[in-house]
Design a protein with these regions (language model features):
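Cleavable N-terminal signal peptides of Sec/SRP-targeted secreted and luminal proteins
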Residues: 1-20
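Cleaved targeting-peptide boundary
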Residues: 21-25
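Extracellular/luminal segments of secreted precursors and ectodomains of membrane proteins
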Residues: 32-65, 70, 74-86, 95, ...
Length: 270
């Protein structure tokens, strides 16, 4: 059985923007350096892979660039996992393949509630591939890895509304025959979205599961420089199009205490 304190799955690593090894140099960006970065639609905050750590985790380049138009095959691949990403993208095929392989590890824990899983995937799809990545991603430190500059840490701006909806859709999802809550395994038992985000953003040491870079989740985006928090649609676990079982979503209207009574009255009246 997975230990929940060591189950910070590689799903949280997918963006491939790792820290350098401990002996490498980290450069903290000043506010002035940050302001020189371009933020806006169809612009990436980081693009392509610059190398790999000693533990094999690939790392992204920390340079902004225009989003790119994928070929039809890559576009279809991305749409199959990330339906919110259409048109241009901010990830290479190698980066997307890494994302897809690593998020697969979360699916067994969250698949019982499609709304939760969709919200969870959207969190990482937007971070990895959104063509508007620079609007809500800010590179805050650069690390040297084998003489290459790599992303060392980022700020990820997300609305509190999305964070709250994500957590609410997932907090009661059960995993396996043990009937344990999935959040114990993918969120170390977080009690709210801020605790979950803090867990997701924690930097892991080399060779341990977890994020190879620090992610600082924030909601206070500086709109004066073209930034705004990520806020894709988040689904309630009671959403009829992505319905979850009552065991995974006891708050759903169809799972309220009055629903079964009404159902039984109909049965008895027949």
């Amino acid at each position: 059985m997975y230990n929940m304190h060591h189950s910070h799955f590689n799903i949280l690593l997918f963006v491939s923007i790792g820290n350098a090894e401990r002996s490498d140099t980290r450069i903290l960006l000043t506010s002035n350096a940050t302001l020189r970065e371009k933020h806006g639609e169809d612009y990436c905050a980081m693009y392509d892979i610059c190398g790999a750590r000693s533990d094999g985790k690939v790392v992204n380049c920390p340079f902004g660039s225009p989003s790119v138009k994928p070929d039809d095959l890559l576009s279809a691949k991305i749409q199959s996992l990330c339906p919110t990403i259409s048109g241009n993208i901010c990830c290479t095929e190698a980066q997307f393949d890494t994302l897809r392989a690593q998020v697969q590890q979360a699916i067994p824990f969250l698949v019982g509630c499609p709304a939760c899983l969709r919200n969870f995937l959207n969190l990482f799809c937007e971070l990895s591939c959104s063509p508007h990545q620079s609007q809500f991603i800010n590179v805050t430190s650069i690390s040297k890895l084998k003489n290459n500059s790599t992303v060392g840490s980022i700020d990820y701006y997300i609305t509190d509304a999305f964070g709250e909806s994500l957590f609410e859709s997932c907090k009661e999802v059960k995993f396996g025959t043990m009937n344990s809550r999935a959040i114990e395994f993918v969120g170390a038992g977080a009690k709210n979205f801020r605790e979950w985000f803090a867990f997701i953003g924690r930097k892991a040491s080399p060779d341990l599961p977890g994020s190879p870079y620090a992610i600082n989740f924030r909601s206070d985006a500086d709109e004066s420089i073209g930034m705004k928090p990520m806020n894709v649609t988040a689904y309630s676990c009671g959403d009829t199009s992505l319905g979850c079982s009552c065991g995974d979503c006891p708050s759903a209207p169809v799972c309220s205490s009055s629903a079964p009574q009404h159902f039984m009255k109909r049965i008895l009246a027949q």
